[in-house]
Design a protein with these regions (language model features):
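Short, contiguous strand/loop micro-motifs
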Residues: 15-17, 48-49, 76-77, 99, ...
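Flexible, non-catalytic linker and terminal segments flanking ANL/adenylate-forming cores
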Residues: 1-22
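Conserved AMP-binding/adenylate-forming core of the ANL superfamily
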Residues: 20-21, 30, 38-83, 87-91, ...
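A short, compositionally biased
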Residues: 1-2, 33-38, 176-179
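Alpha-helix-centered segments that form part of catalytic cores
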Residues: 22, 26, 171-179
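Structural core segment of the AMP-binding/adenylate-forming
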Residues: 67-68, 95-176
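Residues that form generic nucleotide/phosphate-binding pockets
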Residues: 28-35, 164
C-alpha cells in the first residue's frame, strides 16, 4: 500500500516509529514533549498548539483529574470530535495514570449509556455541544465527574467567535412557516 500521507510530513519527521523503543504511550509523549517542544503538535481550524503547550495543558488537566480522587487505572471517557481539546485530554488522561474511553460524540442517549456502563467510566470530558446527551444518562452510570469544554476554548480570539456561533446555532431553529 502506498503511504501517500508521508509526502505531507515536515522535514525530519520519520516515516516509521520503532514501537519497541517505548514501554508506553506516556513514555513516547514525554520524550516528544522534550524533543519537539517548539514544534507544532496539532493544528485545528488554522490554530496550532506546540508540544510544549500540549505538555503544559495536559499536565494541568491530568493533575486536575488526579485531584478528583480517581484511582490509578480509572476510566475517563472522552466525548468530542477531532478538535485540539482531544489530544490534550488524551495525553492528560494517560499521563495521570488513567485509561481513555473514546465515546462517539454523535451517540444517542441509549448508546452513550451503554458505553459508559460497559466501560465503567468514572469521569467524562465532553464538549458542551454534546453535554445534554451526557446529562440525560448520567444518573444511570458510574460517572462521578463531568468536565465540559467549548469548541473554541483553544482557538484564541477565533474561539470566542466559534463559541458564539455554536451557541447561537443551538438556540435557533428553522421556522417552517416561512416556506
Amino acid at each position: 500500500m502506498e503511504r501517500i500521507w508521508l509526502k505531507h510530513y515536515p522535514a525530519g519527521v520519520p516515516a516509521d516509529i520503532d514501537v519497541t523503543q517505548y514501554s508506553s504511550l506516556v513514555e513516547l509523549l514525554e520524550e516528544s514533549f522534550k524533543k519537539f517542544a517548539d514544534r507544532k503538535a496539532f493544528i485545528c481550524m488554522d490554530k496550532a498548539i506546540t508540544y510544549r503547550e500540549l505538555d503544559e495543558m495536559s499536565s494541568a488537566l491530568g493533575a486536575y483529574l488526579q485531584s478528583k480522587g480517581l484511582q490509578k487505572g480509572a476510566r475517563v471517557a472522552l466525548m468530542m470530535p477531532n478538535v485540539l481539546q482531544y489530544p490534550v485530554a488524551t495525553a492528560a488522561v494517560l499521563r495521570a495514570g488513567f485509561a481513555v474511553v473514546n465515546v462517539n460524540p454523535l451517540y444517542t442517549p441509549r448508546e452513550l449509556e451503554h458505553q459508559l456502563k460497559d466501560s465503567g467510566a468514572e469521569a467524562i470530558i465532553v464538549l458542551e455541544n454534546f453535554a445534554t446527551t451526557v446529562q440525560k444518562v448520567l444518573p444511570n452510570t458510574a460517572v462521578k465527574h463531568v468536565i465540559v469544554g467549548s469548541m473554541g476554548d483553544l482557538l484564541g480570539l477565533k474561539g470566542v467567535i466559534v463559541n458564539l456561533v455554536v451557541r447561537d446555532r443551538k438556540s435557533t431553529r428553522l421556522n417552517s412557516s416561512h416556506r
